[in-house]
A protein has these predicted regions:
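A generic structural motif
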Residues: 27-33, 57, 94-96, 144-146, ...
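An acidic-aromatic
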Residues: 43-115, 174-182
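Short, hydrophobic/aromatic-rich segments at coil-to-beta transitions
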Residues: 17-27, 49-55, 134-142, 164-170
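Short acidic, Pro/Gly- and aromatic-enriched capping/linker segments at domain boundaries
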Residues: 114-132, 187-197
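Short, cysteine-centered beta-strand-loop-beta hairpins and adjacent loop/turn segments enriched
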Residues: 31-37, 61-67, 146-152
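Hydrophobic/aromatic beta-strand elements that line small-molecule binding cavities or substrate pockets
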Residues: 40-46, 79-83, 126-131, 154-159, ...
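N-terminal leader/targeting segments and the immediate start of mature chains
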Residues: 1-53, 198-228
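Gly/Pro-enriched, hydrophobic low-complexity segments
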Residues: 134-202
């Protein structure tokens, strides 16, 4: 998920050079070749420059079994924030319920791929109609993306006239799957810089194996401190 946002910015910037900074409620869905929903990921999304914030409620993901969702909620691991800082070449996974986070580097391979996408990808766009999406009058555009040594990809964008042509709905169509991204309650404004920083009092964990023991210990300490 963390790597989707920078690619989204590169793709949109090639189509809309003046892509605005904004915040919105986002929905990402993946369907298989038969049209069956395989993954749903609702999130609060914010874009500031080349940096991104995605707030995810894990209990709102239907693909996660109910008993697992309950366990995550009990341990306060149900709220996850992804902060992608391209300028620092870092991704932060922040668990606000336990005041802890993980930090990962953005690989040079990934950053090189972003650079290639921004320079070598050829996009052809064709207006195929108009449509109103969530109350916004949109131009519907078919996009064909070609890149050396890679198969051609196609997608459809709905660009909102009253939101500086921001695509508020995107469908990327592949051979055996379809990705759909939608933005609602869009606010065209520069998000606060503090949203892209990890709170100073949060504990940095060494690796992902530390999350569950740390959350369990926090829960045990909270239970011990509770009035009897």
């Amino acid at each position: 998920m963390a790597t989707i946002a920078p690619r989204f910015k590169v793709f949109i910037s090639k189509l809309c050079p003046d892509v605005p900074e904004f915040s919105a409620k986002a929905s990402e869905q993946i369907f298989d070749g038969q049209g069956n929903l395989r993954m749903s990921l609702p999130a609060n999304f914010a874009l500031r420059g080349d940096n991104f914030r995605q707030e995810i409620d894990m209990t709102a993901m239907p693909q996660i079994p109910p008993e697992q969702r309950k366990a995550m909620e009990f341990l306060k691991l149900d709220k996850l924030t992804l902060i992608t800082r391209v300028d620092r070449k870092r991704v932060y996974l922040v668990f606000s319920g336990i005041h802890a986070y993980l930090e990962f580097p953005l690989s040079e391979t990934f950053l090189n791929e972003l650079n290639v996408q921004s320079t070598a990808v050829n996009l052809q766009k064709t207006k195929i109609g108009t449509e109103t999406i969530n109350g916004h009058a949109c131009t519907k555009i078919k996009v064909t993306a070609s890149e050396p040594n890679k198969p051609t990809e196609e997608g459809i964008l709905w660009c909102a006239a009253d939101l500086q042509q921001l695509p508020i709905k995107i469908e990327s169509i592949g051979k055996d799957r379809m990705l759909r991204i939608e933005f609602q309650d869009v606010q065209i404004a520069k998000p606060n810089a503090s949203l892209f920083e990890v709170p100073a009092d949060y504990v940095r964990l060494s690796n992902s194996k530390d999350i569950l023991p740390y959350a369990t210990a926090k829960q045990r300490d909270a239970k011990s401190a509770a009035p009897k």
